Amino acid sequence: MKTRGFSFPRQRQVLFLFLFWGVSLAGSGFGRYSVTEETEKGSFVVNLAKDLGLAEGKLAARGTRVVSDDNKQYLLLDSHTGNLLTNEKLDREKLCGPKEPCMLYFQILMDDPFQIYRAELRVRDINDHSPVFRHKEMVLKISENTAEGTAFRLERAQDPDEGHNSIQNYTISPNSFFHIKISGSDEGMIYPELVLDKALDREEQEELSLTLTALDGGSPSRSGTSTIRIVVLDVNDNAPQFAQALYETQAPENSPVGSRIVKVSAGDADSGVNAEVSYSFFDASEDILTTFQINPSSGEIFLRELLDYELVNSYKRNIQAMDGGGLSARCTVLIKVLDSNDNPPELIISSLSNSVAENSPGIVLAVFKIKDRDSGENGKTICYVQDNLPFFLKPSVDNFYILMTEGALDRESKAEYNITITVTDLGTPRLKTEHSITLQVSDVNDNAPAFTQTSYTLFVRENNSPALHVGSVSPTDGDSGTNAQVTYSLLPPQDPHLPLASLVSINADNGHLFALRSLDYEALQAFEFRVGATDRGSPALSSEALVRVLVLDANDNSPFVLYPLQNGSAPCTELVPRAAEPGYLVTKVVAVDGDSGQNAWLSYQLLKATEPGLFGVWAHNGEVRTARLLSERDAAKHRLVVLVKDNGEPPRSATATLHVLLVDGFSQPYLPLPEAAPAQAQADSLTVYLVVALASVSSLFLLSVLLFVAVRLCRRSRAASVGRCSVPEGPFPGHLVDVSGTGTLFQSYQYEVCLTGGSETGEFKFLKPITRHLPPHRVGKEIEENSTLHNSFGFNY
C-alpha cells in the first residue's frame, strides 16, 4: 500500500533554504554599527539618514522601520531626525553569552519603492563582572612521594566578560611548596596548574591551605579567589587509566530526560582503597552541570534536562577519574546533539496594512520574515497563500517576503478578505505555521448615483398647502462612506419661462420634493424638470432623472351663468303667450365651469317658481319650457330660480333668476316688474367680454324695436287713446329671448310695443298679440307640432 506524500498548492509556493540565494530588491545594502553594553535607553547609535545618504524627512516619508531577526525591538528609529537609538539597556552577556563578538542583526525597511537594508550592531563588552570560582574551596590529595615538578590542573574561574575583560592571570598565595603555571586549551581558555616545587612530607605537615586568585584584564582589574586545601597522602603508586582518551557520542535533541548518553570507564592497577575509582565532571560550566549528571561509581552520564540543537549543538567537557589514594586521570567526552524537526517555522510580520484602496494593483500589503530554527531538510520551508485570492507572495532578501495585490480589487464585489499565509517545513513530520490577515478594501468613488427610475411621475392636487411634500427620488450608490452620500439639486429647466424655483424645491440631503406654493390646475396642468444627484466623492460623480408633476383638478370653481346675465342689472324678462303649448321653449340657461372632468359636468334644476308645475328645466342643457297648457287663471308674472350644479365632490352651484311674463292681448295693462337687488359679484375678464357682447346685442335689439314701433305708428290711421299706442305690424325679432341660437320660439307670435311718454325708466308695455292669418293647413300643422312637444319633453319641476 502506497503512502501519499504531503501535498501543497502548486501556485504561489516559495521554496527557499536558509542559505539564501541572494534574491534582492533594488537598493539593498549592508551597514555595521556598534554600541557599548549597559548604555542607557535612548542612547545614540547612528544617524541613518546621513549614513544612507537620504535627505532630511525622507525616512518618515518612506515609512522607514527597523526590524530585528528575533523580532525584538532592541533599537528605535526616530524617523524625523533619522537617529537610530537604543530601545533598552543592552546586556552583552544576556544577549550573546560567551560568544564573541556579540552581534545583533537587523533590517531597515523602506517603502516607495520598497527596499531592505541589512545591518548589524556589535555590542561591545565592558568589565562589569568579576571572576568567580564555582567552589570556594578545592581539595587536592597529593601523595608524599610525588615528584617535584608535577603539575596539578585546577578548576578555572568563570568570567562572563569577553576579550581583555575576561580572566588573564592566576596567582597563588606565597608558600614554599607550589607555584602557579598558566596553560591554554583548545577552546582558547586558560587554566591554572599547581606545580610542586618541593617534596611533601606527611609526617611534617599533613595539610596545606593556599589561596588561588583569578585576575581579569579590565581597567580597573577585577578578581576572585578560592581556597586550595592540600591533603598529603601516603604513597599510591598507580593513577587511574581511561580506556579512551576521547569519548564521542550522539544524542537526539528530543531525547527524554533521564536518558543515558555515554559511559566512561577507568581502571586502576592498585588495590584496595587506592583502586576505588570515582568519576566527576572536571572544571564543568554551569550549563554542563544543569544539562548532564554523572554517576560517580559507574561513570554513566545521564540527561538531566532536554537538549535543544538550536541553542547548543555539541558539548565537550572533561571527565575526571580519581582513586582512593588521590591520583586522578582525565578524558574528554564530546556529545553531538542531533537535530530533529521540533521547531515549526516562524513568521515574523515586519509591516502590515489592514486596508487597501480598491482599483490599486501591485500594492504592498505586508512584509514578513520566515525563520526555521531547525537545520537541513527540517529547515527548508514552503510559503503560500490561498489560490482563490487576488494576492501573491514575492521573495526578497534575508528570507523576507512581500504580500502584494495581484490585480485591482473591487470593494463593491467583496469588501473584506481573510488571507491565510501558510509556512510549512520539509521535515518529518512536517510542521507548519499559519498567520491570518483580515484585509479591508477601502472605497474609491467609482460608482455614480443611480436612480431607480429614469423618470418619476408625481400627482399633486391643486390648492395644496405650501411646502407640501409631493414625493421623493431615491438613487442608490454602490460606494460607501462619503462616496455614497448623495446631494440632490434641481437642474435648470429646459423651458426658460417655467418659474421652477417658485414651484418646487428639493431637500438636498434626502431627495424629498416639496411644492412651494399652492398650484392652480386652471393655470398650470403639468410641468416637468430634472433632478440631479451628486455624491461627495473626489472627484464627485452625478446622474439625473426626469420628474413630471401632474396637477389634479379640484372642484374649486362654481358654475358661472352666462345667460341670463346675473350682474345686478335689470332682470331678464321672458315673454310667453298664454296660448303656448306644453314644452314651449321659454329660454335657455347657459353656464360654464372653470374646472375639468366631472367637476365641470353641469346639471340644471328648477329651484323655485312662483307657481310650481307650470315650468320645467331640462336637466342636461338648461332649457326652460312650459310644463302644461297655460290658462287665464295663471298669474301674468312669474319668477323662476334655476339651480346650476356641477358634479364635483363636494358639488358647487350657482343660481339664475328668470322673470316670465304671460301675455294674451294688448288691452291688458302693463304691470311693472320689481327691481332686482344688485348682486355683488366679482367679474373676471371672461365676464367683462360677455357683458360687452350682450350689451352690443341688446343695443341692436333695442334699435330694432324702435324702428319697428316707428313703422307701426306710421301705418296706423286711428289715433290712440290715453295709455294706448298704435299696433305695429311686421315680424317680431326671433332672437329676442333665444340667446342660445336654438330658434325654438314660434315666429307666428308678434307683439305691439309702445313707449310711454315721459317714462324715465325706459319701460315698455306689451299689449295683446296680433295673430297672423295663416292658411288652414299651416294652422293645423302647428297645433299638431305643439301637441307633440307637449308629450315628448321631460322637465324638472
From Swiss-Prot:
An example GO biological process term is: cell adhesion
Is the keyword Transmembrane helix in the record? yes
Location in the cell reads: Cell membrane
| Signal peptide region | 1-26
UniProt main location, coarse = membrane
The record gives the membrane topology as:
Single-pass type I membrane protein
Residue ranges annotated as Extracellular topological domain: 27-690
Residue ranges of every copy of the Cadherin domain listed in the record? 35-133, 138-242, 247-347, 352-451, 456-561, 568-671
Cellular component, GO, one term: plasma membrane
> Which parts of the chain span the membrane according to its record?
691-711
SUPFAM superfamilies assigned: Cadherin-like (SSF49313)
**In UniProt terms, what function does this protein have?**
Potential calcium-dependent cell-adhesion protein. May be involved in the establishment and maintenance of specific neuronal connections in the brain.
What is this protein's name?
Answer: Protocadherin beta-9
Q: Which organism is it from?
A: Pan troglodytes (Chimpanzee)
**What lineage is on file?**
Eukaryota, Metazoa, Chordata, Craniata, Vertebrata
Q: Which gene encodes it?
A: PCDHB9
